[in-house]
């Protein structure tokens, strides 16, 4: 009998999620670069989702004309995941990178709680151990810098809310089991764009008003590159995966983003990186490997 995590490409999917999330650990860098270039008020994030939607819209129209789904039945997944992704993206603009990461990376805890309460799934001590190990890694990596993780800045609250929304969206995706990547991706981008717009009033008072047309045009090549080569492919890989590997495994694997984020922030900003960050990052990686290997597909011999 096959276990729940019985997808034939379970380990490969986990590896792609781990790498994609790690790439998101560098996302703060282009976000800050856009802000420095004058794309204030979160308009750099808005532009990325406008470009992504412009790419996907012709495909959606073609699918409609050919009687195929464009994802309307998965609107709840799109609302949760798209809003969560944008809250995270904008959290990097209005707080320190390390603070945004710590509040976002309560995700494994949210994911396991959601699986337990809403999906009625029971876990053994292995899951308790991996979640505890991952959270311990988070605490060691950033606890010495931020102390008790209590939200103070707007970006702290954005990061906290982003983690919960993405965990909830992952659970919803696991329940709905979207047929194919495009329908879910299209809904995520649509609701992500909506989220960028309603967040603008909160961001304009902190990081400035709408940029000028000249600044927007000069930033367009950079925005096209981020949207087409980063936002679309990584969003597709990350948010499709919970339906194949489970919400809890997803929540732990995306901790690779924290590892990359902490190290890159230490190298490229004045934020510190010492033995706590090294030990914490190691614990997070170990937790991810343990979770994947303990849930990889295997066949039980007939009794």
Spans of model-derived segments:
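Loop-to-transmembrane-helix transition segments
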Residues: 12-20, 63-87, 131, 154-161, ...
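Transmembrane alpha-helical segments that form core, pore/gating elements
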Residues: 17, 21, 25-33, 56, ...
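Transmembrane alpha-helices of multi-pass small-molecule transport proteins
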Residues: 12-13, 36-83, 110-111, 164-172, ...
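Specific transmembrane alpha-helical segments of multi-pass solute transporters/efflux pumps
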Residues: 23-26, 60-99, 104, 140, ...
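Structural signature of hydrophobic alpha-helical transmembrane segments
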Residues: 39-52, 90-107, 152-165, 216-228, ...
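C-terminal transmembrane-helix exit sites in multi-pass transporters
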Residues: 60-63, 90, 107-132, 259-278
